[in-house]
Swiss-Prot record:
Keywords assigned: RNA suppression of termination, Transport, Viral movement protein
Signal peptide stretch: none
Keyword Transferase found: no
Keyword Transport assigned: yes
Protein name (database record): Protein p31
Other remarks in the entry: Readthrough of the terminator UGA occurs at position 69.
GO biological process, one term: transport of virus in host, cell to cell
Highest rank taxon of the organism: Viruses
Family: In the N-terminal section; belongs to the carmovirus double gene block protein 1 family.
Length: 279
């Protein structure tokens, strides 16, 4: 069920009581998180009966990327707050976020989010098929699905602990920080195009630059995704993951702008705000 098909109850309380959906909004930026269907407990195929899997069907952030006060839209932040509110324990992110092709001001998860309780429930081996079926997602493949098939290693779930005392559950990053040139090359090769949140995605940056954000800034996508090193460190650490603090300006001479802080499927990354070699 998508947000466009759901009639919103008049209040957050009513929505939680009636559908188990949590809504968070920020008046200053007119942001609305719709249809986080934490909702029903569903038995995972192949798992013991007492082990339940909670599915969040779809996450849609309307209007633009300014979801939090830092001007950083990271769906994992949103999901983490919902998981924490419902005391659901750890969860795994099985998909990436992408830009709305029409407006450039939306990010969503095109596949299911599996929220695991504190049992030993395992993620199904055939995540691409089984999770979509359990979550009731459409069978039509998105660009994210195609890229996942071609490069499944890029989408391996990254366990995130919401309890700082359980930091040992957070695996170390498999790569060193500041891999922007490498991933820009992947963007150039069309592996992550249209749902990656890099500014260096070919064909996206120039188009989005022409669309003012709701605060009247001409380059809304770029501005809304940039944050300072200290801010990134604080935000990332608040979710139980040690952020990378490599001084990118010293590593990459061409880096002269604020850096981008966001969630990549392999772990937290702080990357230069642009890749001029592709612009």
């Amino acid at each position: 069920m998508s947000s466009s098909q759901t009639q919103s109850p008049p209040t957050d309380v009513a929505r939680r009581q009636q559908t188990g959906t949590a809504v968070r909004s920020e008046d200053n930026h007119r942001n609305q998180l719709e249809n986080i269907a934490v909702g029903k407990l569903t038995k995972s195929e192949g798992a013991p009966a007492q082990q339940n899997v909670i599915i969040a069907k779809e996450v849609v952030i309307n209007n633009h990327f300014n979801f939090n006060x830092a001007g950083v839209c990271v769906c994992r932040f949103v999901l983490a707050s919902v998981v924490k509110e419902f005391n659901l324990g750890d969860f795994d992110l099985l998909d990436s976020v992408h830009l709305d092709e029409d407006t450039g001001h939306r990010c969503r998860l095109s596949r299911a989010i599996g929220v695991l309780d504190r049992s030993d429930t395992k993620i199904p081996k055939d995540r691409h098929t089984q999770w979509r079926q359990v979550a009731g997602l459409p069978e039509v493949e998105s660009s994210a699905d195609v890229a996942w098939k071609q490069n499944p290693e890029l989408f391996e779930p990254t366990r995130l602990s919401l309890d700082p005392t359980r930091s040992e559950t957070v695996p170390p990053l498999r790569e060193q920080p500041a891999p922007c040139p490498k991933f820009c090359l992947q963007c150039q090769q069309q592996l992550l195009t249209r749902f990656s949140r890099f500014q260096c995605v070919q064909g996206l940056t120039s188009r989005l630059e022409r669309r003012p954000d709701t605060l009247g800034r001409p380059n809304g996508w770029q501005h809304n995704h940039r944050c300072g090193i200290q801010l990134c460190s604080t935000l990332c650490a608040s979710l139980g993951r040690h952020s990378q603090q490599t001084p990118l300006a010293d590593t990459f001479p061409w880096h002269s702008s604020p850096i981008t802080c966001y969630q990549y499927p392999l772990g937290w990354r702080m990357l230069p705000g642009s890749c001029p070699q592709l612009q």
